[in-house]
């Protein structure tokens, strides 16, 4: 089996995006916070599937 490394790029967190648009306070009023807080960590990587990669 082969290991493929996917480069990750840090994206804007949901918390930061909501704050920039002035929506964080409203979001906090109606949202429950899960035990695992992932609002401040967003990483993305491009994945290609198939031959040729698409």
Curated annotation (Swiss-Prot):
Keywords: Aspartyl protease, Digestion, Hydrolase, Protease, Zymogen. Its EC number is 3.4.23.4. It comes from the Eukaryota. It catalyses: Broad specificity similar to that of pepsin A. Clots milk by cleavage of a single 104-Ser-Phe-|-Met-Ala-107 bond in kappa-chain of casein. GO terms for biological process: digestion; proteolysis. One of its GO terms (molecular function) is aspartic-type endopeptidase activity. InterPro entries: Aspartic_peptidase_N, Peptidase_aspartic_dom_sf. Residues 1-27 form a propeptide. It holds the Pfam family A1_Propeptide. Belongs to the peptidase A1 family. Chymosin is synthesized in the mucosa of the stomach. The enzyme hydrolyzes casein to paracasein. Monomer. This is Chymosin. It comes from Felis catus.
């Amino acid at each position: 089996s082969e290991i493929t490394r996917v480069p990750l790029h840090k994206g804007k967190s949901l918390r930061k995006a909501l704050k920039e648009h002035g929506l964080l306070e409203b979001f906090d009023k109606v949202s429950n916070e899960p035990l695992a807080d992932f609002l401040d960590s967003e990483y993305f990587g491009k994945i290609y599937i198939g031959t040729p990669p698409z």
